[in-house]
UniProtKB/Swiss-Prot annotation:
GO terms for cellular component: chloroplast; ribonucleoprotein complex; ribosome. The lineage of its organism: Eukaryota, Rhodophyta, Bangiophyceae, Cyanidiales, Cyanidiaceae. One of its GO terms (biological process) is translation. Binds together with bS18 to 16S ribosomal RNA. PANTHER family: MITOCHONDRIAL 28S RIBOSOMAL PROTEIN S6, SMALL RIBOSOMAL SUBUNIT PROTEIN BS6M. It comes from Cyanidium caldarium. The gene is rps6. Gene3D superfamilies: 3.30.70.60. Belongs to the bacterial ribosomal protein bS6 family. The keyword Manganese does not apply. This is Small ribosomal subunit protein bS6c.
Length: 103
């Protein structure tokens, strides 16, 4: 397999905040988080940091849910990594909302 090296100066720091369904079973939740970590590593994301912000009440109902589980990802990567992660997030039905920020 050919190794790809990306110059560090071409990488950008990104933050993704997710709101997930509160009724999601623990094993599916943990499986989703591990899949996202593996996806980021496969696509050469550097300094990948994941933090669970916990369950919080939403300001307004989303898909009839009053609560949501907040997850925050921080990573250093290229636009390709970001686009592949966004495609993966769009396929996940348990995500109520997400936002991407360049930090």
């Amino acid at each position: 397999m050919k190794t790809i090296t990306i110059p560090r100066q071409n990488l950008t720091q990104y933050e993704i905040m997710l709101i997930m369904r509160p009724d999601l079973p623990e094993e599916k939740f943990l499986k989703f988080l591990s899949e996202i970590k593996e996806h980021a590593k496969r696509n050469l994301a550097l300094e990948f940091n994941l933090s669970n912000r916990g369950r919080r009440k939403l300001a307004y109902a989303m898909r009839k849910f009053q609560d949501g589980i907040y997850i925050q990802f921080n990573f250093l990567g290229s636009g390709y990594i970001l686009n592949s992660l966004i495609k993966r997030l769009k396929l996940e039905e348990s995500i109520l909302r997400y936002i991407v920020q360049k930090t």
